[in-house]
């Protein structure tokens, strides 16, 4: 049996699903348990509750995570991982000068994710195009890469204004960007 998990808020990067339905690239998507399928839409309203971080090492060959750190809230915390190390072996940028090319390549599979738990509300569509209303639906928004700092800065600005995260409703939108052949949102 599978363990129930919190649906993830993601940005859709697939042009179509397994049934050939066209999907809106760059839209947010969640798996909605009541609908039994993914719902796509943007912009969305997001109410954050908790923000934390976690290191994970992913193997493309095994299509699985090889290790995960504890979930931590502060950079001063020591993120011990599931294989007995720290940060899943991720070496801080300032310490990478002496790494070999292979060691640097290995670092790409190890990432720090910002985990933001909250609720989403939006008017979306199913893959087949049916309208679907999502209201105050609990999700995990896991961000890394170019999203990591902007999301962190937005959440930090809430606390700097002496507001509680769960009293704030953020409007989230995506923006298409390109770097060479890579397209990201």
What are these regions (language model features)?
Residues 1-132, 179-183:
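OB-fold ssDNA-binding interfaces and closely related basic DNA-contact patches used
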Residues 112-184:
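Extended serine/threonine-enriched, polar tracts that run as long, contiguous segments within proteins
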């Amino acid at each position: 049996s599978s363990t129930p998990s919190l649906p993830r808020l993601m940005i859709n990067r697939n042009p179509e699903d397994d049934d050939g339905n066209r999907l809106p690239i760059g839209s947010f998507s969640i798996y909605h348990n009541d609908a039994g399928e993914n719902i796509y839409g943007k912009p969305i309203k997001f109410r954050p509750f908790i923000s934390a971080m976690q290191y994970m090492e992913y193997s493309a060959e095994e299509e699985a995570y090889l290790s995960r750190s504890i979930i931590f809230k502060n950079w001063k915390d020591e993120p011990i991982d599931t294989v007995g190390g720290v940060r899943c072996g991720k070496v801080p940028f300032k310490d990478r000068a002496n790494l070999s090319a292979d060691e640097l390549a290995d670092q790409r599979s190890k990432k720090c994710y910002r985990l933001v738990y909250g609720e989403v509300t939006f008017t979306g569509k199913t893959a087949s195009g049916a309208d679907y209303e999502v209201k105050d639906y609990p999700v995990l928004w896991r961000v890394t890469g170019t999203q990591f700092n902007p999301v962190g800065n937005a959440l930090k600005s809430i606390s700097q204004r002496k507001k509680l995260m769960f009293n704030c409703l953020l409007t989230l939108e995506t923006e298409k960007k390109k770097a060479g052949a890579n397209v990201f949102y």
